[in-house]
Amino acid sequence: MQAVQREIAEQLNVQPPFADDQALEAEVARRISFIQDCLTSSGLKTLVLGISGGVDSLTAGLLAQRAMRELRERTGDEAYKFIAVRLPYDVQFDEHDAQASVDFIAPDERHTVNIGPAVKSLASEVAAFEGKHAVSVDFVLGNTKARMRMVAQYTIAGATHGLVIGTDHAAEAVMGFFTKFGDGACDLAPLSGLVKNQVRAIARSFGAPESLVEKVPTADLEDLSPGKPDEASHGVTYAEIDAFLHGEPVRQEAFDIIVNTYKKTHHKRVMPFAP
């Protein structure tokens, strides 16, 4: 492990690989307890999470639903609920995967909020500030979608006395692969410190369908590139990112991309700059 790998792994609190199934089960239990502690210490009763159809929200949703079920069993308080929210931008190209994820999670409540009208309304109001190139306009619109999804989740959480769950994990955090104040905003992040293959392993431990566990990850924020794979945006694979974070050797080009991207996206992982 090179010094910079160790430094980055420590800053992101990267967890070691699961040694065996027992270690995986212990980590699942620890993260469920974390979710329960966050909620009970807040005095609130619900958890809210947007379900996209990807493995990250699937895994976070499975942890949240089990946490709520155990809290109800332990306390007898039926007010503890997990609310799963679908947040499509009009029609989502992989809606069948999103619905399959919600079905497998079996949340206490499920709702759908179409963010399309709100995003388009805002875009029309600020059109004078947009760039001249379609690609840059599409990129900005993608970030607006992510932020509108979080606005919706916090609105629901506020109305139901709840907390919002985030899906950030170490393999995305190191690349700054999230929208500031969009999917990067949340009250608790139960996947924090995990690499991508650990997120998948946890989903498998719940018996999740392999089609969802191994689905090609995509943020799906850009209209001009629907379903664009995360790895195409990264320039490296998640396997390489995972290996880097666990101190394993990776090809030099991948090493340089990860380190340089980590440095460039530093501002996304810290509190606002202040004098």
Swiss-Prot record:
Q: In which pathway does it act?
A: Cofactor biosynthesis; NAD(+) biosynthesis; NAD(+) from deamido-NAD(+) (ammonia route): step 1/1
UniProt binding sites for deamido-NAD(+): 147, 180, 187, 267-268
Annotated binding of Mg(2+), by residue:
56, 172
Its GO biological process annotations read:
NAD biosynthetic process
Any one cellular-component term (Gene Ontology): cytoplasm
| Reactions listed under catalytic activity | deamido-NAD(+) + NH4(+) + ATP = AMP + diphosphate + NAD(+) + H(+)
Record GO terms (molecular function): ATP binding; glutaminase activity; metal ion binding; NAD+ synthase (glutamine-hydrolyzing) activity; NAD+ synthase activity
Work out whether the entry's keyword set contains Transport.
no
Binding residues annotated for ATP, in chain numbering: 50-57, 167, 196, 218
Pfam families attached to this UniProt entry: NAD_synthase
Top-level taxonomic group: Bacteria
Per the entry, what this protein does is: Catalyzes the ATP-dependent amidation of deamido-NAD to form NAD. Uses ammonia as a nitrogen source.
UniProt lists the family membership as follows: Belongs to the NAD synthetase family.
Assembly behavior: Homodimer.
Protein name stated in the entry = NH(3)-dependent NAD(+) synthetase
What gene does the UniProt entry assign to this protein?
A: nadE
